[in-house]
Amino acid sequence: MSQNTGKITQVIGAVVDVEFEPGKLPEIYHALRVTNPAINDSENNLVLEVAQHLGENSVRTIAMDSTDGLKRGQAVLDTGKQICAPVGKKTLGRIINVIGEPVDEMGPIGNDKENPIHREAPPFEDQSTKVEAFTTGIKVVDLLAPYARGGKIGLFGGAGVGKTVLIMELINNIARQHGGFSVFAGVGERTREGNDLWMEMKETGVLEKTALVYGQMNEPPGARARVALTALSIAEHFRDDEGLDVLLFIDNIFRFTQAGSEVSALLGRIPSAVGYQPTLATEMGELQERITSTKNGSITSVQAIYVPADDLTDPAPATAFAHLDATTVLSRQIAELGIYPAVDPLDSTSRILDPQVIGEEHYAIARQVQYILQKYKDLQDIIAILGMDELSEEDKLIVARARKIQRFLSQPFFVAEVFTGSPGKYVELKDTIKGFQEIVSGKHDHLPEQAFYMVGSIEEAVEKAAKLAAV
């Protein structure tokens, strides 16, 4: 069979128009290949994905790499299939890019199976509805917004409040304890962070159970808009073909939307609210619906979601909210108090914070903690204007306990040891529940609040209080 070739008629940034012979138009999402000498010396090194049929035998495509160096009239080859990602155990311990090529200079992947990156979500009858919580070892998460196995979790936060550190701690804790395979998608984030993560994983021994897929900030929007789908294809293979429970980490899902917005404008679509693409909800839905649990295996996904200007009503984070089972909201106000992880205990939610799933005791203590923190928040205006002395004795007690709870929700992280000098702590769920139950019941009312800051279990807080008293 002769190969189907076309020629470039127009190049505008990351968008390339290609003309084919009559009756030979490639299908939407098909990958085309062209040689771009500006990238490297190899043949057909640039992949273009068909996005639109323009009429007059032309297609509009999105480039997955730099288009500098392309010329009008250049020959373009239709591969006759979608962009495919290498799947299977050979991808573990490797870093690949959006088109499935290794970028870690460790030679070819040598896999024998590939999956297309665009696929349908599993049908309803194949999906699993079983609900169970899994422990992360992070107190604030396990107590107030527990994560569901096979669920979707969003970490929301503005710039610099600790989303990537939290996601790295979750990889460290869950991947170590979970023992299964993980897939990490670096979507439009800093290359330095990607490098840090790779080094960290290598040192902790998690790397051989993780596949890394990177499309960083410096890549064209086409690559950033598709890299999450490449990672998802790898995770789907482990779930569907090998029947495993997989962890999928995406940092950052906002960059997926941002890249879609750039591409949408280049494709000539009229922008929607706040300049986002009109297809925002559809694109997010197509990605999120594929991240699900089936009767065969599960994908538990943790997604960092950047919140532009700390505005949770922005269309990008607001669209992601609808798909999530648990949300962990990071707050700048809490970060300013020096409390890390800077999780907002009143804004974070979980579908499984339900006595039927987590048990009566856990539920009751979580609600008591939220009540005390909410009461403290309500009293803050009075304290700011009139001072603590004007409060009733009961309110003074609530404020004292709330401040202890607030500090006890902080925790030293394993991945932050190099910055803080404090050894990381993994806290079992039973210890978390016991600790907060003791604070709420007033057992530790006599201890100073700084004893509860940056410790693991309640025993460590008591020990720290004894050391403080001895000074």
From Swiss-Prot:
It is a peripheral membrane protein. It holds the Pfam family ATP-synt_VA_C. F-type ATPases have 2 components, CF(1) - the catalytic core - and CF(0) - the membrane proton channel. CF(1) has five subunits: alpha(3), beta(3), gamma(1), delta(1), epsilon(1). CF(0) has three main subunits: a(1), b(2) and c(9-12). The alpha and beta chains form an alternating ring which encloses part of the gamma chain. CF(1) is attached to CF(0) by a central stalk formed by the gamma and epsilon chains, while a peripheral stalk is formed by the delta and b chains. Its main location: membrane. The lineage of its organism: Bacteria, Pseudomonadati, Thermodesulfobacteriota, Desulfuromonadia, Desulfuromonadales. Keywords: ATP synthesis, ATP-binding, Cell inner membrane, Cell membrane, CF(1), Hydrogen ion transport, Ion transport, Membrane, Nucleotide-binding, Translocase, Transport. GO terms for molecular function: ATP binding; ATP hydrolysis activity; proton-transporting ATP synthase activity, rotational mechanism. Produces ATP from ADP in the presence of a proton gradient across the membrane. The catalytic sites are hosted primarily by the beta subunits. Belongs to the ATPase alpha/beta chains family. It is found in: Cell inner membrane. PANTHER family: ATP SYNTHASE, ATP SYNTHASE SUBUNIT BETA, MITOCHONDRIAL. GO terms for cellular component: plasma membrane; proton-transporting ATP synthase complex. Its EC number is 7.1.2.2. It catalyses: ATP + H2O + 4 H(+)(in) = ADP + phosphate + 5 H(+)(out). ATP binds at residues 157-164. NCBIfam families: atpD. This is ATP synthase subunit beta 1. It comes from the Bacteria. The keyword Nucleotidyltransferase does not apply.
